Amino acid sequence: MEKKKNNPIYLGFASQKGGVGKSSLAEVLASILYYEKNISLAVVDCDGTQESFYKLRERDRDLIESSPELGKELHERLSRYGKKSYHIIRSKPERAVSDVMKYFRKMKTAPQLIIFDFPGHALTSAMMDLSITMDYIISPIEADPQSLASSFAYARTIRDLGIGFEGSRIQDFFLLWNKINRSASTTVIDLFSQNAREQGLPIFDTRIYNSVRFSRELAQGGVKGVFRCSYLPPAMALRPQTGVDEWVREVMEKLNLKTEDSV
């Protein structure tokens, strides 16, 4: 589907279980797409009490303000990208879309992509209402049969609502294997991947592998060794063997995202 310039893609990150890395993946994706791939975007943090995006930006900002040297180094790095940091809208599920509309009215041109970080448990009436306003939803899953059952149920519900509800925007729902242990058996993963395909539930080909690198913020890695940061993409040296770059390419392909100079 060809995207209209003033009709942004709404991408939601949702999960049925806390701790699956939903927000970390959304943060990494946003930074790579915005700073490296030159895709205009904004983030809506409606993750309840967690507010992962908002609090990450706060930690980044506080650290920069307390360290002039780090602030100077970060400013020099940002100048290479030729842009300011992406905007984060602090919101709640029931007013997330209206808050986005207010943001649009302040903009000359709407961004290409809006990323919504959902609360950790999506089966509430407010979350179901928000889910069907998305164009796409990405739901990270882990190799745990109990949590997989609830994740699959949510995916089926959204798929069926998207088909049967006239006001739905939903185009596709993607499951994503996350925190995969390279040394562990893939029996559960292979079994549930096949089960997802049989149920008609799309699943990314890419798998994201478990790594302590995902926890490296600006305070631990500095500008040259950071992985999670709202002002910078993950350091290139930290990405091999994580699956992140392969996944970002797959996201761009599935969502038909274009770099700004090719839009």
Regions of interest found by a model, annotated:
Residues M1-S15:
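Extreme N-terminal, non-catalytic leader segments
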Residues A14-V20, Y34-I114:
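P-loop/Walker-type NTP enzyme "switch/lid" segment
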Residues S24-L25, L29:
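Hydrophobic positions on the alpha1 helix immediately C-terminal to the Walker A/P-loop
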Residues A30, Y34-Y35, S131:
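Gly/Ala-rich phosphate-binding loop of Rossmann-like dinucleotide-binding domains
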Residues S125-P145:
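Inter-motif core of Ras-like GTPase G domains
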Residues S151-G167:
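Conserved C-terminal guanine-recognition region of P-loop GTPase G domains, centered on the G4
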Residues K179-C229:
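Beta-strand-loop-alpha "switch" segments that mediate conformational coupling across diverse proteins
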Residues V226-V263:
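NTP-binding/hydrolysis catalytic cores, primarily Walker-type P-loop NTPases
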